[in-house]
UniProtKB/Swiss-Prot annotation:
It comes from Thermodesulfovibrio yellowstonii (strain ATCC 51303 / DSM 11347 / YP87). HAMAP family: RemA. It comes from the Bacteria. The lineage of its organism: Bacteria, Pseudomonadati, Nitrospirota, Thermodesulfovibrionia, Thermodesulfovibrionales. InterPro entries: RemA-like (IPR007169). This is Putative regulatory protein THEYE_A0405.
Amino acid sequence: MLVNIGFGNIVSLSRIIAVVNPGSSPMKRMKDEARKRGKLIDATEGRKTRSIIITDSDHIILSALQVETILQRINEINRVEDGDL
């Protein structure tokens, strides 16, 4: 399944390890290290980064959506898969 992370950008749900807030120093360091390694994907369309998505391929994806919004979308997909709708 695919998750919309904003502005028409989508990520495979099975590849997501974590969705975290970008404000902490460790997350800023992780973002900088990913940029140096060529593993940073900026999906913010020039807007403020409001969440960081960590994938199993060691890519770091920046999103302009709040962590809670992405979580709601993931939960909605899981409900549909489980047949709860």
